[in-house]
Amino acid sequence: MPAIRHLSGLDNGFDQPILVFGASMGAMHAANLFFRRPDIFDSVFAISGIYDSDIYFPGYMDDVLYRNTPCTYIPNMPADHPYIRQYNDRKMLFVVGQGAWEDELLASTRRLQSVLESKGIHARFEYWGHDVDHDWPWWYKMVETYLPQFID
């Protein structure tokens, strides 16, 4: 990350904000990177992600899984954790459809929204229609709709 910040500074005259973005499994990775390092990443844009581990590992938890499952570690953050302020100073957008192959992702996104709200973390959640499937054509439309909002 230091090299990216340095090179962007050389090309632009100042450090550029760094957005983490992903769809499907990439959304989970983007969200996890952002939540674990809000000091590095300025924003997160996650589409159709799963943010808890129960879907893949029902009833199982170890330290590695815990540290990589936002719906598990965020509830245990103290109310005065400095990351909470940092989260609220940054842009967060989570988008999911409600069509084919989105059921588990929709439920996980709603759980993440509930977790964040319970901690006073102000993220934006967008729920697209029941015709919006877990597939690239829809993700392209979501990117076209929302990515410009991250570019200042």
Language-model features, listed with the residues they occupy:
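Non-catalytic cap/lid and distal C-terminal segments of serine-dependent acyl enzymes
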Residues: 1-152
